[in-house]
């Protein structure tokens, strides 16, 4: 029933298997590629374009379902939603690798779907997906003249060793994360992040990838020959020679004027690139006037003529479209700290390309939780790239970020990420947003420069300034020119888009896309060296504006402070059902994170809020101490007094004689359950805490003035007044350890003897307040009230992971 073709090879330390003829047999081409424990089903389907176009309508979609890692999707619907950024980036890698290899002028619609069936989290899925797409194209009958293969490359600098398709563990130690793709004769696409590697080390990685892909290319050819392609689609390029000749004779002057003076844009919007404007004008007029050519033929002819005109001008006159030399950078203007309430901002303008980059700092609670097929993780550095239509003078509705925006944002992220401080040194979550306000090429590299400037303006301690530059290529036969800092027309009409970002010490990100069938290593080497010169020039311009990160962050940046509490007190801080910690957050406006080891992180916009929250937490975790005043709440009424809950769950007794400085008939006459009170600790006997209300001002929480013992011949020793207050407190006067009578009210009453614990004096019948009570406290400050109210805690327990509130 199944006509199965299967080929395999030992590649690296794993077995690579390509198989077809069993699954998805209705597709033009379908293969299953296994590499280690990673498996991808790649399918290809083609059909004639519904409308005339002058480009290749190729769509590549990489899909990663949860079953590939043995999981059920979360959420209510329990199925996958829109593609993740990781899936989108892999789709772009495959697209950018195979697109240049199709014949010029081939405009059939092609859809390639790469479905991740299994993932062992060791073998990279992007490698398997590209090999699968190339193998499926090889047996589909679609014109695809040469196979392509790709590999992920790592590098251990200490060992000077490159790694083929590194595992996650190896990648964590690697100073390079590169994806390479190419044919037997040339390099087609490169994407990488690096820890300031040299140009020689990066070129070595590309060479290593090229050498190791050779056996995979042989395997694809062997597999295609064994499987036997379906009927090959005969592709005959359009004969557009006459159309090109007509365009040249009728409109060459307009194009020459447009490209000889880049600032002069005839018959077009002042913001539209000249070539694109002329194309629109010529296409419309020529189709109407001639009547013998289709719109697709005219568009292709115009593009062919335009390319030949510009390329000949560059190679013959050694001058570019805008008159610059090959290695000349456009004029650069830089401004920082221009958005008042942002945490940091920068405006980077290079020629007609401009990026407004703004930063915002947040707490660890603002980290992005990424739930992907690579595993769950938290991301503390976010970089978002936005490209509105007004940046190129077009009237179009704003839409959510597409593949291009996601890809450009990720490239800038790769460039900045290696120079960021560690979380231990700078615990903030960092978000950078790049708003492209003008674009004429290299907007992603303007984002890199603007992001570096904005982060330094924010106060993020970067290791070094980071700059990026886009290189271009014009190649005709053996003649070629490498162009620095390309503009939009040079990107559109050129053969290469080679973006390099890094510091003075090395490369942090590299991306190379080709529009021809690859280039040799000599051109790559020259491009890297020329890019280094341009990068250093741009960093010099940036350093003149801001060379180092600012000291500290702005006042309106969220504040973060930590404190350590006893692990056994965690449950007290959290409270029953989170009652206590929730009350602290609501009252002060802070966010609190509690770790299992007793570390408490407090986040707030203002320092005052942080201090207030710290005071409330200290109030909960502190142990009762004789002479200290605390806030509490009445939890129980008894005939002989009232029980008060304080310090997040501790209970103490206020004897009826310690409620007021006057006689009361019943406790319930003056107190009720849930009343908020201020109490003074006057005695501790093991776990029994004795409290007093009458000695504390119930409004301010301060000790009452003139509160002391005095001797009375008639009634014996009595409580009288003693001086006190913010300046400090003295010991209460000592007396015989017998019954005492207290003055005040309508007469004296017997007072029960109490133990003052270690704070008692003499015979132990008197209470003492330590001299330091009432003086400024290094934790609580002078404000004894703290505005805390009751703090109940009777459960919650420690947590295995940090708890966020």
Curated annotation (Swiss-Prot):
Q: Where is this region: Disordered?
A: 702-805
Annotated Gene Ontology cellular components are:
cytosol
List where in the cell it is found.
Cytoplasm
Q: Which CDD domains match?
A: KH-I_PNPase (cd02393), RNase_PH_PNPase_2 (cd11364)
Query: By its UniProt entry, which Pfam families does this protein fall under?
Result: KH_1, RNase_PH, RNase_PH_C, S1
InterPro entries tied to this protein: ExoRNase_PH_dom1 (IPR001247), ExoRNase_PH_dom2 (IPR015847), ExoRNase_PH_dom2_sf (IPR036345), KH_dom (IPR004087), KH_dom_type_1 (IPR004088), KH_dom_type_1_sf (IPR036612), NA-bd_OB-fold (IPR012340), PNPase (IPR012162)
Residues reported to bind Mg(2+): 491, 497
Q: Which reaction does it catalyse?
A: RNA(n+1) + phosphate = RNA(n) + a ribonucleoside 5'-diphosphate
An annotated Gene Ontology molecular function: RNA binding
The KH domain is annotated at 558-617
The family database entries (Gene3D superfamilies) matched by this protein are listed as:
GHMP Kinase, N-terminal domain (3.30.230.70), K Homology domain, type 1 (3.30.1370.10), Nucleic acid-binding proteins (2.40.50.140)
**Which cofactor does the UniProt annotation name?**
Mg(2+)
Annotated PROSITE patterns: KH_TYPE_1, S1
Biological processes per GO annotation: mRNA catabolic process
Instruction: Give the keywords, sorted.
Output: Cytoplasm, Magnesium, Metal-binding, Nucleotidyltransferase, RNA-binding, Transferase
User: Which ranges carry the S1 motif domain?
Assistant: 627-694
Q: What is its EC number?
A: 2.7.7.8
Q: Which HAMAP family match?
A: PNPase (MF_01595)
NCBIfam families given for it? polynuc_phos (TIGR03591), PRK11824.1 (NF008805)
What is the annotated role of this protein in its UniProt record? Answer: Involved in mRNA degradation. Catalyzes the phosphorolysis of single-stranded polyribonucleotides processively in the 3'- to 5'-direction.
Q: What is this protein called?
A: Polyribonucleotide nucleotidyltransferase
Question: What is the organism of origin for this protein?
Answer: Anaplasma marginale (strain Florida)
Which gene underlies this protein? Answer: pnp
């Amino acid at each position: 029933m199944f006509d199965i073709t299967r080929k395999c090879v030992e590649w690296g330390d794993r077995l690579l298997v390509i198989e077809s003829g069993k699954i998805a047999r209705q597709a033009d081409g379908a293969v299953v590629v296994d590499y280690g424990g990673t498996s991808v089903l790649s399918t290809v389907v083609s059909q004639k374009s519904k409308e005339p176009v002058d480009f290749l309508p190729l769509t590549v979609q990489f899909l990663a379902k949860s079953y590939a890692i043995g999981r059920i999707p979360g959420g209510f619907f329990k199925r996958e939603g829109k593609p993740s950024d990781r899936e989108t980036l892999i789709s772009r890698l495959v697209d950018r690798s195979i697109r240049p290899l199709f014949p010029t002028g081939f405009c059939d619609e092609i859809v390639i779907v790469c479905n991740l069936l299994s993932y062992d989290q060791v073998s990279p899925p992007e490698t398997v997906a590209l090999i699968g797409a190339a193998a499926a194209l090889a047996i589909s009958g679609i014109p695809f003249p040469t196979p392509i293969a790709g590999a992920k490359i790592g590098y251990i600098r200490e060992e000077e060793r490159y790694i083929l398709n590194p595992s996650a563990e190896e990648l964590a130690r690697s100073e390079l994360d590169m994806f390479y793709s190419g044919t037997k004769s040339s390099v087609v696409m490169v994407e990488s992040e690096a820890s300031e590697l040299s140009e020689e080390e990066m070129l070595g990685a590309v060479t290593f990838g090229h050498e190791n892909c050779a056996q995979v290319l042989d395997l694809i050819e062997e597999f295609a020959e064994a499987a036997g392609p379906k009927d090959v689609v005969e592709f005959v390029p359009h004969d557009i020679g006459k159309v090109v000749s007509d365009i040249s004779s009728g409109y060459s002057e307009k194009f020459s004027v447009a490209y000889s003076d880049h600032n002069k844009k005839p018959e077009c919007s002042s913001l539209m690139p000249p070539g694109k404007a002329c194309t629109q004008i010529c296409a419309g007029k020529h189709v109407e006037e001639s009547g013998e050519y289709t719109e697709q033929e005219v568009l292709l002819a115009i593009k062919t003529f335009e390319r030949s005109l510009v390329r000949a001008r560059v190679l013959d006159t050694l001058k570019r479209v805008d008159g610059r030399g090959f290695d000349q950078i456009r004029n650069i203007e830089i401004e920082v700290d221009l958005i008042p309430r942002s945490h940091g901002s920068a405006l980077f303008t290079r020629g007609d390309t401009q990026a407004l980059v703004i930063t915002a700092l947040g707490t660890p609670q603002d980290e992005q939780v990424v739930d992907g097929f690579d595993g769950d993780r938290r991301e503390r550095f976010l970089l978002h790239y936005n490209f509105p239509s007004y940046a190129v003078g077009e009237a179009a509705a704003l839409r959510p970020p597409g593949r291009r925006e996601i890809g450009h944002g990720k490239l800038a992220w790769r460039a900045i990420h290696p120079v960021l401080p560690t979380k231990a040194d700078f615990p903030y979550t960092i978000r950078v947003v790049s708003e492209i306000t003008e674009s004429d090429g290299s907007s992603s590299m303007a984002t890199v420069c603007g992001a570096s400037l904005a982060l330094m303006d924010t106060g993020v301690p970067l290791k070094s300034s980071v700059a990026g530059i886009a290189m271009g290529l014009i190649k005709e036969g053996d003649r070629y020119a490498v162009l620095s800092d390309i503009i939009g027309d040079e990107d559109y009409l050129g053969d290469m888009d080679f973006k390099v970002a890094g510091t003075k010490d090395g490369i942090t990100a590299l991306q190379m896309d080709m529009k021809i069938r690859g280039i040799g290593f000599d051109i790559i080497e020259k491009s890297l060296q020329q890019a280094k010169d341009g990068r250093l020039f741009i960093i010099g311009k940036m350093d003149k504006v801001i060379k180092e990160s600012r000291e500290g962050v702005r006042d309106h940046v969220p504040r973060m402070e930590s404190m350590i509490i006893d692990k056994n007190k965690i449950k007290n801080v959290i409270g029953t059902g989170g009652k206590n910690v929730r009350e602290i957050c609501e009252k002060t406006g802070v966010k609190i994170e509690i770790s299992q080891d007793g570390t408490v992180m407090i986040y707030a916009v203002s320092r005052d809020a942080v201090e207030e929250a710290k005071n409330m937490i200290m109030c909960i975790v502190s142990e009762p101490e004789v002479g200290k005043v605390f806030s509490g709440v009445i939890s129980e009424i008894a005939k002989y007094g009232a029980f008060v809950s304080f310090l997040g769950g501790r209970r103490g007794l206020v004897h009826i004689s310690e409620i007021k400085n006057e006689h009361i008939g019943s406790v319930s006459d003056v107190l009720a359950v849930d009343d908020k009170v201020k109490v003074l600790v006057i005695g501790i006997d093991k776990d029994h805490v004795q409290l007093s209300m009458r000695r504390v001002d119930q409004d301010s929480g301060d000790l009452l003035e003139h509160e002391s013992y005095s001797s009375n011949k008639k009634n014996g020793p009595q409580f009288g007044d003693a001086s006190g207050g913010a300046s400090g407190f003295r010991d209460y006067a000592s007396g015989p350890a017998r019954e005492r009578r207290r003055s005040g009210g309508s007469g004296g009453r017997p007072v029960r003897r109490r133990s003052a614990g270690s704070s008692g004096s003499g015979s132990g019948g008197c209470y003492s307040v330590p001299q330091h009570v009432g003086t400024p406290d290094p934790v609580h400050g002078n404000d004894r009230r703290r505005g805390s109210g009751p703090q109940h805690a009777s459960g919650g327990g420690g947590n295995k992971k940090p708890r966020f509130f």
